[in-house]
UniProtKB/Swiss-Prot annotation:
UniProt topology in membrane: Multi-pass membrane protein
Extracellular-facing ranges: 28-43, 93-235
Sorted UniProt keywords: Cell membrane, Glycoprotein, Membrane, Transmembrane, Transmembrane helix
Primary role: May be involved in the regulation of cell differentiation.
Ranges facing Cytoplasmic side: 1-6, 65-71, 257-285
BP-aspect Gene Ontology terms: auxin-activated signaling pathway
Name of the protein this chain belongs to: Tetraspanin-3
Organism: Arabidopsis thaliana (Mouse-ear cress)
Compartments in which it is found: Cell membrane
Coiled coil: none
Pfam family, one: Tetraspanin
Recorded name of the encoding gene: TET3
């Protein structure tokens, strides 16, 4: 029994350590929500899951140390629910960020972003005028476009140098007009609109050289936010999938050790056949 308790304690300690990357991923997304992506709701489920794993693993660790079978049982039940929630969350994150990506542009190092390339619930949420008002205000306050400017020994960046840059989705979608507008480059956030092509892209009419406006109300800016969010979530999802696989392995080990503790407490010999007519087998915690 002591060996099984030690094993359960070790598994719970390792599970506690596994909660750190999940919680760290949620905190990282939260920091980006305040400065880059400006979407402040998707990170909270991840933070809650990370904290829950921490608390439950500590309860299981205490149960193993003090041989409290109730705490061990509670760990197994709640951890099973957490694993199910993490699976659902990973599926949801992939589903809402599945479609959409930037379009390559001839002779440009950056991509252009178009809202029609995205679809689903997340696009509808970002497209909502009242919600977008909060996001665009966050983008302005974060100075996303102020950081785009560059100079070399006091010399401003030339058009050719700018065109070869790899801009982030937010910088490309919110800080410059779409390439198909045909505006002439003046500086990173200033463009000569004379002689441009006002075609079917409505963002060409929305663009403003006013530094407080730029393309914050453009559909391309909304698409850029979605593109940035997709990149962030895909990075975090890879970590979550790895953690999920390890969690499942640890859970199976903890369950086997818990069953062994119960078997010893009930004075059942190892390898006892439980499939008999008088003693049918029951699968229970």
């Amino acid at each position: 029994m002591r060996t099984s308790n030690h094993l359960i304690g070790l598994v719970n300690f390792l599970t506690f350590l596994l909660s750190i990357p999940i919680l760290g991923g949620g905190i990282w997304l939260s920091s980006r929500a305040n400065s880059t992506d400006c979407l402040r709701f998707l990170q909270w489920p991840l933070i809650v899951i990370g904290i829950s794993i921490m608390v439950v693993s500590l309860a299981g660790f205490a149960g193993a140390c003090y041989r409290n079978k109730f705490l061990m049982w509670l760990y197994l039940v709640v951890m099973l629910l957490i694993i199910a929630a993490l699976i659902g969350f990973i599926i949801f994150a992939y589903a809402v960020t599945d479609k959409g990506s930037g379009r390559t542009v001839l002779n440009r190092g950056y991509l252009d972003y178009y809202l029609e390339d995205y679809s689903g619930w997340l696009k509808d949420r970002v497209s909502d005028d009242s919600y977008w008002g909060k996001i665009s205000s966050c983008l302005r306050d974060s100075g996303a476009c102020r950081k785009i400017g560059r100079n070399f020994n006091g010399v401003p960046e030339t058009a050719d140098m700018f065109f070869l840059r790899r801009l982030s989705p937010v910088e490309s979608g919110c800080c410059k007009p779409p390439t198909d507008c045909g505006f002439s480059y003046v500086n990173e956030t200033g463009w000569d609109t004379r002689g441009g092509m006002i075609g079917p892209n409505q963002d060409c009419m929305v663009w403003s050289n006013d530094q407080s406006m730029l393309c914050y109300q453009c559909s391309s800016c909304k698409a850029g936010v979605l593109g940035s969010l997709k990149k962030s979530w895909r990075k975090v999802s890879v970590i979550n999938i790895v953690v999920l696989i390890i969690l499942v392995i640890f859970y199976v080990i903890a369950y086997a050790a818990y069953r062994n503790v119960k078997r010893i407490d009930n004075d059942e010999p190892a390898g006892e056949a439980r499939m008999t007519k008088s003693h049918p087998s029951h699968f229970h915690l």
